[in-house]
Amino acid sequence: MLRKKHFSWMLVILILIAVLSFIKLPYYITKPGEATELASLIKVEGGYPEKGSLSLMTVKVGPANPFTYVWAKMHPYYEIVPDESIKEEGESDKEYMKRQLQMMKSSQENAVIAAYQKAGKKVSYSFNGIYASSVVENMPAKGKIEVGDKIISADGKNYQSAEKLIDYISSKKAGDKVTLKIEREEKEKRVTLTLKQFPDEPDRAGIGVSLYTDRNVKVEPDIDFEIENIGGPSAGLMMSLEIYNQLTKPDETKGYDIAGTGTIDVDGKVGPIGGIDQKVVAADKAGKDIFFAPNQNGASNSDYKNAVKTAKDIDSNMKIVPVDTMQDAIDYLNKLKAKST
């Protein structure tokens, strides 16, 4: 009888868990992802091999249900974020992934241009425009800018990359205005927006729109990407280092397993990303030796400083290295002695 009662309770619990797993909450759960070595995903024709490795970092994202919500509450480095922080209002999963993959494509192009220029190799590109890929809820661009809008100019000045335009807008402060000339459905219009502080980043002000650059890139030697189902712009730095390492001698890794994160622009400037603590945790779990983190020119709440804190909290032996540019990372690697075996 006791065994039957025990079995009944177990069955009830299993059914309850199954039912709860199908209840969608208005949240997403983010958690540490994986370290993915880039040598097998990026192939430069005639590229040089490496003794160590260069890896991009991912954060896993999934919809929350009551079960995963409670689970996330009990685990460090799991974060519960509102739907609107991940997806736009009315955006389907397919549309969200398309947007993420578009940002990855733009990031790959930036990495290629930065690396080939740094290595002194042939690279040329034509500019097709800057486009809006997402609009943040409760920010000035909401209702004024739509996904797919082409941004022609800001305050009368044209820009040749999303990064340069973002830098210009970021140079302003909360309360300042910016006038954008946009094209939507083959019609041009002007919108004036007043910058506002980001709710989760009070040190930063902006209009709340994500942008990407559309361009055609030609290089010599040829390069091939085999990165699938990984979206977003945060792998830019590590992709640029992998490409550069395949284009040049000697091997920059010197036998070390190197991870890192950060956006990249065509000039090799490194930008901040999200989920730095989760990426540090994932890199440590993967046994990486070195982790490059955006320094943001020494900002008080930079990704680098948060990465250092996380590494200390989890008692990691990884060396956390601050970088503002691709060249900073190369300079650091050039000074390293080869890893002893």
From Swiss-Prot:
Catalytic residues identified in the record: 234, 279
SMART domains on file: PDZ
KW Membrane (keyword) present: yes
Domain of life: Bacteria
GO biological process, one term: proteolysis
Annotated Gene Ontology cellular component terms: plasma membrane
Membrane-crossing residue ranges in chain numbering: 9-29
Cell location: Cell membrane
The keyword Cell inner membrane is assigned to this record: no
Record-linked InterPro entries: La_PDZ (IPR039381), Lon_proteolytic (IPR008269), Lon_Prtase (IPR027065), PDZ (IPR001478), PDZ_sf (IPR036034), Ribosomal_Su5_D2-typ_SF (IPR020568), Ribsml_uS5_D2-typ_fold_subgr (IPR014721)
Annotated GO MF terms: ATP binding; ATP-dependent peptidase activity; serine-type endopeptidase activity
Keywords: Cell membrane, Hydrolase, Membrane, Protease, Serine protease, Transmembrane, Transmembrane helix
Limits of the PDZ domain: 100-186
Annotated ranges, domain Lon proteolytic: 187-336
PANTHER family named in the record: ATP DEPENDENT LON PROTEASE FAMILY MEMBER (PTHR10046)
Protein family per UniProt: Belongs to the peptidase S16 family.
Protein name per Swiss-Prot or TrEMBL: Uncharacterized protein YlbL
